[in-house]
């Protein structure tokens, strides 16, 4: 369907969803995209934990992974991240099906799929929990992540939920 075949109201509605309501300098969905890719790039380069902590809400934080208790503080996340680095040699995140929706003037909801690839250390005491196949140290997990991101002086993740890759997006 071309834009000429849309009614004027439908055409303008489609275009206005991107209008910067809070000025040209306001954070928009492309800023959230950039942040999301930067987040995963830092994982792939084994960045220091301080990068993540500066982008995670500490008081009301909730980071949830399948089969684990939620991480609710910076200390919880730092412990989880230290374990990730201790158990793996490398990892890579292939992000797809990214959807971003503004849910409040200073809040976004992002949902996307991640094909997470990596290699667990052969001497890991958690080998079975990381492996995708019992005959390989390489792993591949397809996951859905859904983030609630707050806008302030920087983007901050308040809630991060990881589910199986077959879970539907909450953004319609």
Regions found by a protein language model. Name each.
Residues 1-16, 107-109, 130-172:
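Short beta-strand edge/turn micro-motifs at domain boundaries
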Residues 27-35, 87-90, 95-97, 152, ...:
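A broad structural signal for short, well-ordered beta-strand segments within beta-sheet-rich domains
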Residues 56, 114-118, 164:
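Short beta-strand segments enriched in hydrophobic/aromatic residues
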Residues 104-126, 141:
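A short hydrophobic beta-strand element
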């Amino acid at each position: 369907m071309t834009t000429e075949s849309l009614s004027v109201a439908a055409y303008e509605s489609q275009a206005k969803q991107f209008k910067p309501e809070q000025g040209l300098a306001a954070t928009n969905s492309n800023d959230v995209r950039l942040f999301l890719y930067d987040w995963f790039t830092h994982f792939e380069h084994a960045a220091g934990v301080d990068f993540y902590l500066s982008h995670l809400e500490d008081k009301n934080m909730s980071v949830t992974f399948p089969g684990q208790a939620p991480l609710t503080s910076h200390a919880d996340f730092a412990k989880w991240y230290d374990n990730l680095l201790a158990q793996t040699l490398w990892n890579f995140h292939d992000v797809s099906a990214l959807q971003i929706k503004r849910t409040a003037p200073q809040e976004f909801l992002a949902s996307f799929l991640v094909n997470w690839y990596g290699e667990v250390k052969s001497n890991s005491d958690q080998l079975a929990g990381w492996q995708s196949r019992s005959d390989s140290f390489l792993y591949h997990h397809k996951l859905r992540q859904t983030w609630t991101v707050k806008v302030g002086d920087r983007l901050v993740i308040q809630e991060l939920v990881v589910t199986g890759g077959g879970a539907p997006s909450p953004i319609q």
